[in-house]
């Protein structure tokens, strides 16, 4: 099966893990700091805190910003953790509709803030598929209204916005090291920031809220969590980070092939990356034309049967039964239509152009046989 994304584990990673497993300290050691320093150097930021997942990173980011009893404005087109973690931190969640690239609509965000901005605890944006949001416009809004900004850049490690690494402009930025991302620590995540006070707070909460006073004594000053990332995982992360730019180049090669081959086809559109951005290509979404919406399940199953592991990103968060019970029925037209249209096809560093051609040929062959027809 040619999956929509795939980890890159080579002999250097295996050797790194073997060495780390033989160390005296498997967790809470120097590899944690080394990984954080490597991330800071790569990102061009001052501070980083690595954690056991991006969900944990989001939870502590919201908590550090003090969103309890306030509203977090976010996108519905994301993995549920973006909103879930805000609820875990005691916030209320409100969804803002998206644009046709899958990113939050900054104009609709501005319209919401014009209505009322007093009780907004944070704005949390997602760089969908690795393609940056319009960060200048969004950052200007958050500064105008004095609202903290979280960039859930879980898709976007290594992506660029106006020649800068994605993750530099927000108060707190989140990254994921899940195996489907360009680098992995098995599970894992990070928060990065130039704000030392916020990162110190997150590091405290990461390990039970405990500080050491003396060699044999400690004090718990906050109610914290066990969100630590092990030294073994961090050792892998350090080695993976060395390969990140190469992995991104390979993903870009596959994406560029698709862009050219899919141009002006009669079945679907693709997302165009603006010339002042560079996507990490975490995903390669195709957006089916409306006459194929109701055939998407048939298309999905046919592609799986042909050995192409597609996926859908994402069901809008407000469509989950939990959120329907919490918030009632919500309809955001662009997010709803994006969900009907979207399929993510294989695009990752383990592929070659022969694989990409197989995906293209198979996709077109199946679509030619699918009967067009609008729903209803």
UniProtKB/Swiss-Prot annotation:
Pfam families recorded: DegT_DnrJ_EryC1
Top-level EC class: transferase
InterPro entries with a match to the protein in the record: DegT/StrS_aminotransferase (IPR000653), PseC (IPR020026), PyrdxlP-dep_Trfase (IPR015424), PyrdxlP-dep_Trfase_major (IPR015421), PyrdxlP-dep_Trfase_small (IPR015422)
UniProt KW Nucleotidyltransferase keyword: no
Protein residues bound to substrate: 4, 24-27, 54, 176, 226, 311-314
EC code(s) of this entry: 2.6.1.92
UniProt catalytic activity: UDP-4-amino-4,6-dideoxy-N-acetyl-beta-L-altrosamine + 2-oxoglutarate = UDP-2-acetamido-2,6-dideoxy-beta-L-arabino-hex-4-ulose + L-glutamate
Protein's GO biological process: polysaccharide biosynthetic process
Gene3D superfamilies linked: Aspartate Aminotransferase, domain 1, Type I PLP-dependent aspartate aminotransferase-like (Major domain)
Keywords: Aminotransferase, Pyridoxal phosphate, Transferase
Superkingdom of the source species: Bacteria
Gene Ontology molecular function, alphabetical: pyridoxal phosphate binding; transaminase activity
Modification N6-(pyridoxal phosphate)lysine occurs at: 181
Transmembrane segments: none
Family: Belongs to the DegT/DnrJ/EryC1 family.
Role, per record: Catalyzes the second step in the biosynthesis of pseudaminic acid, a sialic-acid-like sugar that is used to modify flagellin. Uses UDP-2-acetamido-2,6-dideoxy-beta-L-arabino-4-hexulose as substrate producing UDP-4-amino-4,6-dideoxy-beta-L-AltNAc.
The name this protein goes by in its record: UDP-4-amino-4,6-dideoxy-N-acetyl-beta-L-altrosamine transaminase
Lineage: Bacteria, Pseudomonadati, Campylobacterota, Epsilonproteobacteria, Campylobacterales
